Amino acid sequence: MSTQQTHLKQLEAESIQIMREVAAEFENPVMLYSVGKDSSVLLHLARKAFYPGKIPFPLLHVDTNWKFKEMIEFRDRMAKQYGFDLIVHKNPRGLEMNISPFTHGSAKHTDIMKTEGLKQALDMHGFDAAFGGARRDEEKSRAKERVYSFRDSKHRWDPKNQRPELWNIYNGKVDKGESIRVFPLSNWTELDIWQYIYLENIEIPSLYLAEPRPVVKRDGTLIMVDDERMELEPGEAVEQKMVRFRTLGCYPLTGAVESQATTLPEIIQEMLLCTTSERQGRVIDNDSAGSMEKKKMEGYF
């Protein structure tokens, strides 16, 4: 067995242990399923953790109404293929207001359709623990967040009041109304994720692989034209470029990267040479300085 396989097996074992502990410790856990590569790895780990039984908690997808069409198709196909319980929630207030990233801006769209939508779903179903696919190498606010991330009754995160985590000992004590966000992939890197996907043959949306796609260059970011709702600004033109996505979200707020990587080995090779963050394409991370930390303090993923 190679060193890399040993390393990935150690990460796998750690993540599975965390999942089993949460399933045993909490009354009503849920897994947040955003349909991306990290969610795909989480789903694979959950299936392994509880095999041959069924995953003992539902998966929750907070649908903003602006996800890539392929993401929705992939989500529904995975639910049918693996038979897990899927909860899809859309913020009804946001739908009534017809919230759009074009007319309302990325900050308001994210706050209403993502953050508020997530808090609504967690409260509606009374979940006391929620698995997420965040990793510490993604972004600086996530780098300092614990594996068990305590949230108060308003789902707020206080980065200055986090619980100590010694070795693999986690404190899951919560009072009524409080909850824990759990991040089993905290110690994984983007390269780990891709190598694990390749070794375990995990299915992912084809948006991660490069192919010619219609894009518009806006503020230095390549935005894919995914449907007829895409609003072009004066002087913009749609062009075909060989692109892929390193991260997936709402299509008007997710930048593509030019790439020739059409296979997983080519993506892994690209990652070995890459010096930029995968979240450079997330428009919401550029709303203001420390925007991600502020969003998390308000209840974001």
UniProtKB/Swiss-Prot annotation:
| Example of a GO biological process term | hydrogen sulfide biosynthetic process
Q: Which reaction does it catalyse?
A: sulfate + ATP + H(+) = adenosine 5'-phosphosulfate + diphosphate
For this protein, the Enzyme Commission number is: 2.7.7.4
Q: Give a Pfam family name.
A: PAPS_reduct
Q: Which domain of life is it from?
A: Bacteria
> What pathway, per the record?
Sulfur metabolism; hydrogen sulfide biosynthesis; sulfite from sulfate: step 1/3
Known SUPFAM superfamilies for this protein?
A: Adenine nucleotide alpha hydrolases-like (SSF52402)
Q: Which CDD domains match?
A: Sulfate_adenylyltransferase_2
The cross-references to InterPro entries, in alphabetical order and at most eight, read: PAPS_reduct_dom, Rossmann-like_a/b/a_fold, SO4_adenylTrfase_ssu, Sulfate_adenylyltrnsfr_sub2
Q: State the UniProt keywords alphabetically.
A: ATP-binding, Nucleotide-binding, Nucleotidyltransferase, Transferase
Q: Name one GO molecular function term.
A: ATP binding
The similarity comment for this entry is: Belongs to the PAPS reductase family. CysD subfamily.
Q: How does it assemble?
A: Heterodimer composed of CysD, the smaller subunit, and CysN.
HAMAP family annotated for this entry?
A: Sulf_adenylyltr_sub2
The protein's role, per its UniProt record = With CysN forms the ATP sulfurylase (ATPS) that catalyzes the adenylation of sulfate producing adenosine 5'-phosphosulfate (APS) and diphosphate, the first enzymatic step in sulfur assimilation pathway. APS synthesis involves the formation of a high-energy phosphoric-sulfuric acid anhydride bond driven by GTP hydrolysis by CysN coupled to ATP hydrolysis by CysD.
Record protein name field? Sulfate adenylyltransferase subunit 2
